[in-house]
């Protein structure tokens, strides 16, 4: 991905860049041959290095980069009713804290709080402003996209 992203940034020469990452950073993953997840110091170091690399590549031309927080999700429940690990708010909070820390190290990078927009009460919800914004607990509905895009565009525009 680094070479592909670098080539794309150099080819497009954007005025501003929007980076939306994080869902996969909250799931259990195999790293260096063992299962791990955010919150494990070794995996956190790996995630942070990859995040720093992404921010450096996307912002390599000096362009303003905006990064969204990850919203809480509810992809489903285990048979016992508990949330799957990636849907646990603690993991999302850890990733978003990592984002905040990484962003603070780059003068051309800012944050858009997508979590607050999609979860205004601080917890997962499928409906916001009377609109069903999530279809499966993770992905946006068509109505959700129509509702979110103007806000997202304005957020990027204001930042640039």
Over which residues does each language-model region extend?
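Alpha-helical cap/lid subdomain in secreted, periplasmic
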Residues: 1-138, 142, 146, 150-157
């Amino acid at each position: 991905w680094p070479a592909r992203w670098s080539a794309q940034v150099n080819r497009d020469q954007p005025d501003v860049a929007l980076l939306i990452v994080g869902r996969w950073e909250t799931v259990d993953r195999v790293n260096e041959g063992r299962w791990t997840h955010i919150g494990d110091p070794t995996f956190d170091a790996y995630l942070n290095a990859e995040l720093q690399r992404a921010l450096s590549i996307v912002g390599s031309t000096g362009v303003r980069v905006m990064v969204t927080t990850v919203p809480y999700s509810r992809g489903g429940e285990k048979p016992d009713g508990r949330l799957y690990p990636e849907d646990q708010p603690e993991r999302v909070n850890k990733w978003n804290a990592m984002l905040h820390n990484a962003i603070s190290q780059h003068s051309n990078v800012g944050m858009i709080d997508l979590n607050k927009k999609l979860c205004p009460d601080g917890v997962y919800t499928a409906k916001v402003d009377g609109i069903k914004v999530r279809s499966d607990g993770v992905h946006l509905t068509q109505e959700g996209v129509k509702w979110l895009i103007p806000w997202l565009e304005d957020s990027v525009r204001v930042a640039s």
